[in-house]
Amino acid sequence: ISWKREEADNSIQMPPNFFLKKRKILNRLDGKSLLFLSYHVESYAHRIQDSPMSSDILNYHDIWFKFLSNLKKNIKSKIVFRQGPFNDNWEFKSKFINNFGEKYVSNKKRLEHDFHKSKLVINTAMQTTFFETMKTGIPTIILLKKDLWNLSDDLVGLYNKLKSNKVIFTNYDEAVNHVDKIWENPLLWWNSEKLTELRNEFFKICCLENQNN
């Protein structure tokens, strides 16, 4: 059983229950914030995984800071930093506060509350939080470090489409330029015909929408 569509005869794609009936296409954005969702790993690798492990995350932190620091002043002032409910073993939150100030850190208990106030969401992992963001209809991009993520062969095509359409970035300068370009009205880009088709393809492959599950 998998969220992702699999080719094997003995696999079944099932929709994640907590995403059902939540997908939205927004015609306007009430939020004003740039929501930055940080990614976390444990101090020690204790299993095989296709994402950053242990101290790999430190290189990731450098990219995040460079991205945030190079945003235009008017966008930087709208940053809301949110970290997941885990122990901050790598002290990224403390580093963020030292660089930007505590006033930019979210004080909301639920992610949905930050979504409601957001104009654009920056994800840092192709995991559950990204799926949740896609469901909200709020424009989003993913900032990744290229050599720290491994993809199964059947996802390479979708990954490349997301990258060529400026949803996935592995270069922080390119991500900064894109955010600067779309900031005034991110929905012009996000709701374009090309992006809408790509979002539909993403849900079909990675997050099946089916009420009869």
Enumerate the language-model features and the residues they cover.
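Short, intrinsically disordered, charge-balanced linker/junction segments flanking boundaries
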Residues: 1, 208-212
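Active-site and donor-binding regions of nucleotide-sugar-utilizing enzymes
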Residues: 1-18, 130
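Redox-cofactor binding/interface segments in oxidoreductases and associated redox assembly factors
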Residues: 2, 36, 81, 123, ...
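Short, acidic/turn-prone active-site loops that include or flank metal/cofactor-
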Residues: 5-6, 17-19, 108-110, 145-150
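Short glycine-rich anion-binding loops that position phosphate/pyrophosphate groups of nucleotides
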Residues: 6, 39-41, 127
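Catalytic binding pocket for nucleotide-activated donors in carbohydrate/polymer assembly enzymes
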Residues: 11-13, 29, 97-100, 120, ...
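Conserved catalytic-core segment of nucleotide-activated headgroup transferases in glycan assembly
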Residues: 14-98
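Donor nucleotide-activated moiety binding/catalytic core segment of transferases
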Residues: 75-136, 146-147
